[in-house]
Design a protein with these regions (language model features):
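Short Asp/Glu-rich motifs
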Residues: 3-5, 81-82, 110-111
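Flexible, glycine-rich phosphate/dinucleotide-binding loops
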Residues: 1, 78, 107
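Long, charged alpha-helical interface segments
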Residues: 100-105, 109-151
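Short, hinge-like loop/turn segments at secondary-structure boundaries
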Residues: 8-14, 36, 64, 86-90, ...
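Active-site alpha/beta core segments
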Residues: 1-57, 122, 127
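Structural recognition of alpha->loop->beta junctions
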Residues: 10-20, 87-106
Length: 151
C-alpha cells in the first residue's frame, strides 16, 4: 500500500516477499493475516508510518483476535503529536503494550555474551541512543581501553 518498500528495509530481510495490499488496515488483508498466522506466534511487535490508521487499526484487530500486541511508539508517527498520543492511548486502553525501539532491541539481545549480534547492537546503540550511546563509547575507551572511535 502506498508505494514501494524502502530498499534499506528489504535489504535487512531479502528473503521476505512484501505483501501487496490496498487497504490501510493490514489486518483486513487476508494474505497479511495468513502470513501472521503462519508464523505460529501469538506476540506481535508492530510499528507503522501512520499511527492513527496503519498502526492502530491492525493492533486493535489483532488484540481482538487474541494476539498479544506490542506497539513500538517511537518508530511510528502520527499527523500530529496529539494524534499520535491519542492513538497510542486507544491501543493501550484496548490492551496493547507500548514499547520503544531500544526496549525491543535490547530484549532481543538479552545477554551481552551473545556475540553473534553483539557488535551490530552496539553499532545501533552508539549511533542512535543519545546519552546511552555516548556512555557506551566512554566505557569502551576509559574502562576497556579500546582505541578512540573515528567518525
Amino acid at each position: 500500500f502506498s508505494g514501494y518498500i524502502w530498499p534499506e528495509l528489504l535489504a535487512v530481510h531479502p528473503d521476505v516477499k512484501p505483501i501487496e495490499r490496498t487497504s490501510m488496515n493490514s489486518w483486513e488483508d487476508d494474505a497479511f493475516v495468513a502470513a501472521v498466522k503462519a508464523t505460529g506466534r501469538k506476540k506481535l511487535v508492530i510499528s507503522a508510518l501512520w499511527t492513527e490508521v496503519c498502526l492502530t487499526f491492525p493492533a486493535l484487530m489483532a488484540l481482538e483476535a487474541g494476539y498479544e500486541v506490542y506497539v513500538v511508539t517511537d518508530t511510528s508517527g502520527g499527523t500530529s503529536v496529539d494524534a499520535h498520543e491519542r492513538s497510542i492511548d486507544r491501543m493501550v486502553q484496548a490492551g496493547a503494550v507500548p514499547v520503544t525501539w531500544q526496549q525491543v532491541l535490547l530484549e532481543y539481545q538479552r545477554d551481552w555474551s551473545r556475540k553473534a549480534t553483539y557488535d551490530a547492537v552496539m553499532d545501533l546503540v552508539r549511533e542512535h541512543s543519545g546519552a546511552y550511546g555516548m556512555g557506551v563509547d566512554y566505557a569502551y575507551t576509559m574502562v576497556h581501553g579500546a582505541p578512540e572511535r573515528k567518525a
